Regions:
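Loop/turn-rich, solvent-exposed surfaces of beta-rich toroidal or solenoidal domains
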Residues: 290-317, 322
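C-terminal regulatory/effector modules of DNA-binding transcriptional regulators
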Residues: 162, 204-206, 212-214, 230-232, ...
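Hydrophobic membrane-insertion alpha-helices, especially the h-region
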Residues: 2-13
Length: 390
């Protein structure tokens, strides 16, 4: 009986998503003109997942399953704990690289500093670390936290922005969701946006130009129905200090680049809006296995991931249908890369594409120089990265 109910719920969820007929999509272009900046904020990572990896100039930072921060270089094969403490053996929680009292699986690299969130007296704080791991500085308080990975960060200019991406999604209790702005210069804290309701989450916060962009998502569940939808796309202007709505469409994720706004509407597909000429076209249609997609862009190709969709429809699709779809900016499919063994779809920068496998510290990659024909994932680490108690 339980199995039948689950299948019915899944089918209703699928039908509700795909009942969205292709619409005359409306975008508020006035507030998104001239939105491009250099992508120092690393918006190419999956903003709707864990952040256990961050790109640096030559290599990458990674949070291991033991909650140690390490730096690795794919070209040399080197992996080192991020700690410069004299005489430290990097094998206990006194090591600077140990993040076991922090918001888990969240690490960021921005303007030559590492950022993470230690929990002090039940409160997640924003902390900045230099690249070597020798010095740290607490910049300010963010949100109450039990250590789960739901608190995320985004960066724009001289500010970090913190938000809870899912702690209250699916709950029956009313909560107020907030975006908190923290100055990277003096730690000044401001709440720039809030929304109150039941089963809400702020998602996919990214900085482009003067604007901080984000979604607000809502879910409902009853005995007969599961519904997950977006209230649209919003933008907070740093200069004007206000929030405007860019679109009311059911947008799951988006990306801005080269005067274009790319966005995935649930039940329809990937759209491309020309900001200058204010024209919109559907460049990739959703289908039974590819919907609710997240988006990444590396300056050459767009990448869409159906990982979240497969997770929601696990009983129907499961991991076997998980994939990255590589397309050019006109919608031509360049490659479809299976992620059947993936636990997390991470995307990547202009050098490599990443995902997390099912095994311990099974971080996998593909070289983007060969992305047009890439098929096989390679492991970063030959074995789990065990440092504790060595």
């Amino acid at each position: 009986f339980t199995f039948v109910v689950v299948i019915i719920l899944i089918l209703v969820f699928y039908i509700k998503i795909h009942n969205n007929k292709e619409a005359d999509v409306k975008i508020n272009y006035d507030n998104i003109k001239h939105a491009d900046i250099e992508n120092i904020a690393q918006n190419y990572w999956n903003s709707d997942g864990i952040y256990n990896i961050a790109a640096a100039e030559d290599g990458y930072y990674y949070v291991t399953n033991e909650d140690f921060l390490v730096y690795f270089d794919i070209n040399t094969g080197d992996t080192v704990p991020v700690c410069a403490k004299p005489d430290c053996m990097h094998d206990n929680d006194e090591c600077n690289a140990c993040l076991n009292t922090c918001v888990i699986y969240n690490i960021y690299y921005y303007n030559e500093y590492i950022y993470y969130m230690p929990i002090i007296n039940g409160m997640a704080n924003l902390c900045r670390m230099d690249k070597s791991g020798s010095t740290t500085k607490i910049l300010g308080e963010l949100f109450p936290s039990d250590g789960s990975s739901s608190i995320h960060l985004a960066f724009l200019g001289d500010y970090a922005y913190a938000y809870d991406s899912g702690s209250h999604l699916g709950l029956d209790t009313e909560f107020t969701e907030k975006i908190v702005e923290v100055s990277l210069k003096n730690g000044e804290r401001n709440e720039i946006y809030d929304v109150t309701g039941v089963s809400l989450a702020i998602k996919n916060v990214k900085g482009f130009g003067d604007g901080l962009y984000f979604n607000v998502q809502h879910s409902e569940r009853s005995d007969e129905n599961i519904s997950i939808s977006s209230y649209g796309l919003y933008m907070y202007s740093q200069s004007e200090k206000n929030v405007s709505q860019i679109s009311t469409e059911n947008i799951n994720d988006y990306y801005l680049s080269d005067n274009y706004l790319y966005y995935f509407i649930n039940g329809q597909g990937l759209y491309k809006s020309d900001i200058e000429n204010q024209k919109t076209e559907l460049i990739y249609k959703s289908n039974k296995a590819v919907d609710m997609c997240n988006i990444s862009y590396d300056g050459r190709y767009l990448y869409i991931s159906n990982g979240k969709y497969c997770d929601y429809l696990r009983k129907v699709l499961g991991n076997k249908e998980k994939k990255y779809i590589v397309i050019d900016t006109d919608g031509k499919v360049i490659n479809e890369i299976s992620c059947a063994d993936s636990l997390e779809m991470l995307f990547g920068d202009d050098r490599y594409l990443f995902c997390m496998g099912m095994g311990e510290d099974q971080l996998m990659y593909m070289d983007k120089r060969e992305i047009e024909k890439a098929e096989e994932w390679k492991n970063i680490f030959s074995e789990p990265v065990h440092l504790l108690g060595r």
